[in-house]
Amino acid sequence: MSEQGVSFGKALQLTNVLRDVPGDLAHGRCYLPARELAALGLGPRDLLEPAGAARARPLYRRLLGLALEHYDVAWDYTLAIPRREWRMRLACAWPLLIGLATLAALTAHPNPLGVTAPVKIPAAPCALLARSAFTVWSNRALAAHAARVRATIAV
């Protein structure tokens, strides 16, 4: 369960890193792997240019895929929490649903490295959160919620 908890944290952290790349670059920060950027012949400043952002797209997609792998493990962690601990299950499920919706918005964006404002999730996933409060006791229903959101992510 401890290793699953680590993946839970990595899923959310990697989502934040991927969502915040443009803003971080504007403030002189870059949390993408420097070694992998260098292998592509890129530095952080190159990502500010459309050509550099386009060349970094495979790395960005790979990191999105890695985040999804961590989300899969994080859901196993969440579903392992006893059903009677519904508050704890919701405390885990909601960030995961929001994170998956954020990844879906990032993959749907034509140039997530070039956005000027942070990507926000639309209202529909928020309704999914509300519904999850009624199905928190069911592993099948929570897993179905996650699967519906995950199915919208094209990596």
Can you describe what each PLM-predicted range is?
Residues M1-L12, L18, P22-V155:
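Catalytic cores of Mg2+-dependent Asp-rich isoprenoid enzymes
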